[in-house]
Amino acid sequence: KRKDSFDKPITYKRVGHFEENDKDYFGLNKLIREIVEEPKYKIFSDMDGVLTDFEGRFEKYSNGMKPADYEKKFGKDKFWELVDGEGVAFWVGMPWMSDGERYWDYIKDYDTQLLSSPSRSNTSRLGKRLWVRNNMPGVKLILAQAYLKKNYAAPNHILIDDRKSNIDEWRAEGGIGILHTSAADTIQQLKKLGL
């Protein structure tokens, strides 16, 4: 121990070891405590099938046929022709998932941004941006093809997505992936992480 110019005792300890009653003149103990005890998560949320009801919207234009069935019957090109043929309106008019607002209310106060894949047409980029502006103004939207989502993965970065392949790639890059099946299940998994 020695005395500094303020005549207060300074105790030297190993980094990361501190006691509640230690003097913390420079805020180092507080900073260490935040780093060690409170992981800071960044949430990246998918839109289609998580927040927005892509399947329901698609069925409106496909005479009630589910997207997977339509693609299987007519092929991927015809599938995207149907979606992109509706232009910006397809995306702007997308309804919320039945539990989408509950899910959003739970995550919106964390460091959260949207990470969504556009379709083959640029109209989806505009439509998704307009949907976000109309439904959750000010929220950051990143548009990236599905195979590029993994580039945003990092320790303590959480991807919430309804596609298992996106989750698997995210985890392979060191991120935390939550396969979204419902708001209730995703919220439960977030609670396990302390959120």
Tell what function each PLM region has.
Residues 51, 55, 97-100, 124-129, ...:
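A structural signal for well-ordered alpha-helical scaffolds and beta->alpha junctions
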Residues 115-158, 164-168:
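Substrate-recognition "cap/lid" segment bordering the active-site pocket of phosphatases
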Residues 39-84, 172, 182:
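Active-site neighborhood of HAD-like aspartate-dependent phosphohydrolases
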Residues 158-190:
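Acidic, Mg2+-coordinating phosphoryl-transfer loop and its flanking beta/alpha structural elements
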Residues 39, 108, 151-155:
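Flexible, charged surface loops at secondary-structure boundaries
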Residues 84-114, 121-126:
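Short, acidic loop-to-helix structural element flanking the phosphoryl-transfer center
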Residues 1-43, 50, 68-69, 96-101, ...:
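Charge-dense, intrinsically disordered terminal/linker segments
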